[in-house]
């Protein structure tokens, strides 16, 4: 079969070398790699495999199924749970004895805890809520996907009729039923009543299908999606295609430059208002598909209906916030006013939804702010606790838009009833999963720009704070160096599971940007790019600096003097002055950490410009603390003699210092050896007798950027190993 709507990726040469579990993982990965087949984190796969029981030595049938959490695209063996198939089937007898059973009853939820009793070979992976769906279908291999095309059929008003029209008797339709034990039993009945059926369209949910051969199951999944997609696209084109989608366009898209300008202007302000309870990280989506939707006549109606697939609204909430702004005739101030009133109404609507649908044992109401905001002419902004989550949220609403497009093309889109949506969103099992999440790290939900991140202390600071959950904007005059640091971080920590985002917003926990801090326009552009990547920023650490040696006569020329002050003093002021505008718009507490030096309080020959500039930077720290209070704390780190890993100690300066202090060395001696000699000399002068490294400085930056010293501002923290002459007085 030729596939036009999905990617066929099965490779017999690969699978022939894999064991049965590895084949399941392979199947899962290639299914999950195509967003048209399933969304990130959505769907699950299984195989019933004969294994030797470690207790009895006998062969038993084991269900291997994608466990709770995780993502098909990136899943490995440890992401799959393994359970005795017969024990899972036997749970039906236990369930049958419950006096009060049925959908959404305590008896049904009780079964979830029983899955652990069926664990095979002490596999620690928690079982998915969908485990019964896979166990109770009497076939070896099962794929449960959330394809946009299939959900479009499932979310159509006449879904049952459309399923029959598209698939005949090959696929059976079932009405909405919350995932769990009852849905597993319902699928078991379908298989018994329709022995020739190959799959089921789950009303307002997705697709599930099966086979006794894993390759056949994979190909069946693709062919069923292909049939639905072909049916939808034929109807879509007959209705006028893109030109008539969602009732046709009502507004026109702003050009790319103007979109970036408006996003840069509104996002910090918007982030501050949606982050009243918890800080959010943003993702922009302004591709052709999302713009077609937000600009359309039907967008307000469809957005208000909300999403359908359970996976979607767990991230996107019951509905997005749509702002009816005319990009051709209204300005940014009008947009802010409409956003403000829209946010107020959204919170009221969410509270009303909660109070209307809550049950006696429902968890407390969660953050009432929207996680998806739709703006004509601009696109979509999605919010999450970190970049990966906000990208997943954006992806899910991308999928929701495709579902609505398909459903409207073939029929009429209907959303899941609000009570059903609430019972998923506030399901006690979901709440328990949230409560089991580890505590957030000290810099979680924070966006921090590190200026000077291409080398030395700045690079070390970037690595230190991302370890604690920060999103890091690696900034350097040398763009290649900034990008290299960002790549090191991304390679180490990954980009997360989200795949959405456009432009700079298509990023992970770190981005690399270039900026010249002596050029105000360059600084503003860098800060705007930071906003476009993450929606705003919280703190800035400035480690960029310069040391200019005197000429051979010991004189500092005027241009070198000016350059030293431009970088070491004025640059920090320019960054602070520009950042202050964004901080004020955002209205969230932040930090600014400068780099001064122990030299700022120690007069000596040979470093007149540098020492004087750092003395000015010390006082700049105090002045900025006054200017930016109470919103922003301003402190500084004063390093001394950081030789190893420092861009300020190139080989020629190291040699000059060795000669100055009469430390023996050879001209052809390796740079590393020369650096170690100088570092040890400096260490021996300190009270702690310890070499000072970039990592030592990074620790001080980290502490100042956290809440650990939340009552400290206007201070300089010296990290010099203990130079008594540099004690601050």
Regions found by a protein language model. Name each.
Residues 443-473:
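Canonical Rossmann dinucleotide-binding motif of NAD(H)/NADP(H)-dependent dehydrogenases/reductases
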Residues 551-553, 557-562, 682:
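Substrate-binding pocket helix/loop in short-chain dehydrogenase/reductase
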Residues 576, 613, 621:
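Active-site helix of classical SDR
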Residues 597:
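Residue(s) in the substrate-gating loop at a strand-loop-helix junction
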Residues 629-633, 712-714:
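Short, small/polar-rich loop/turn modules that mediate ligand/substrate recognition or access, typified
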